[in-house]
Amino acid sequence: MSPAAAAEPDGDQQDRHVSKLIFCFFVFGAVLLCVGVLLSIFGFQACQYKPLPDCPMVLKVAGPACAVVGLGAVILARSRAQLQLRAGLQRGQQMDPDRAFICGESRQFAQCLIFGFLFLTSGMLISVLGIWVPGCGSNWAQEPLNETDTGDSEPRMCGFLSLQIMGPLIVLVGLCFFVVAHVKKRNTLNAGQDASEREEGQIQIMEPVQVTVGDSVIIFPPPPPPYFPESSASAVAESPGTNSLLPNENPPSYYSIFNYGRTPTSEGAASERDCESIYTISGTNSSSEASHTPHLPSELPPRYEEKENAAATFLPLSSEPSPP
């Protein structure tokens, strides 16, 4: 097995571990946030009245502390999820790797469901606490010990009206999380259907087309691939040092191919290629004959007059009849 093929399962397994860690941080932060909100509301709204003297002070400290820790965990998980998504896009992942995170659903869908359930439960508890706990009643008022304490004998439980307002608002936030979960699930289903339809279309395009005309069947070959396929374009884009040779929408010009389409060669090969191109243009038959200069003799050719005299002396001698 090649190292690249062995590295891919390790990378997928590491991504799964990171996804599980992010999910745990989300759930832990959401639970702490809701518990902190409930403790804060109960500590600051109910424990500040004299009819409930047994409310400990620790609730007023533990509530905001839990809420802050939970909010920090949620923010940390969110930032880590963004980093994982960017790393996946840089590696060329087009689809979400967490589509089947838990029970065949995506991680974001599960997170939105958990958030919605927690907020919905918290809002209902706050609403029940604000509605069913009696407020502003005479049973909660202390009896005055003397005439000077008559001003302190007024009922003090009217502060639960804020719980009656905050409860439905938190329930509404929980319902909004359910709506977001439904939208994310629908988007995931649409993306999966589009991907499957695209694959089916590519398979159908690569198959030959049969057309029946009367009793004869005409088979048309599949169309040729595109001039610049997406796979080659992405491979060129990912490979370093090829930024100047990226494919464009139109085919490259002749001059760009002639100038930039050469491969680096040695000096001897380059000189031989130049000689071949030059002698091809000049019309010579072979490069060997044109490259070697002819050997010139050291003696000078005879003069033109000497040639005429030699020809004149040769003709009379040849015209005389031979003796018997």
Curated annotation (Swiss-Prot):
Cysteine pairings via disulfide bonds: none
An example Gene Ontology CC term for this record: membrane
InterPro entries in the cross-refs: TMEM171 (IPR029173)
Transmembrane segments: 22-42, 57-77, 113-133, 160-180
Keywords carried by this UniProt record: Membrane, Transmembrane, Transmembrane helix
Region (Disordered): 229-248, 279-304
Localization in the cell: Membrane
UniProt topology in membrane: Multi-pass membrane protein
Pfam family, one: TMEM171
Ranges of Low complexity composition bias in the record: 229-239
Biased composition (Polar residues): 279-291
Protein name as annotated: Transmembrane protein 171
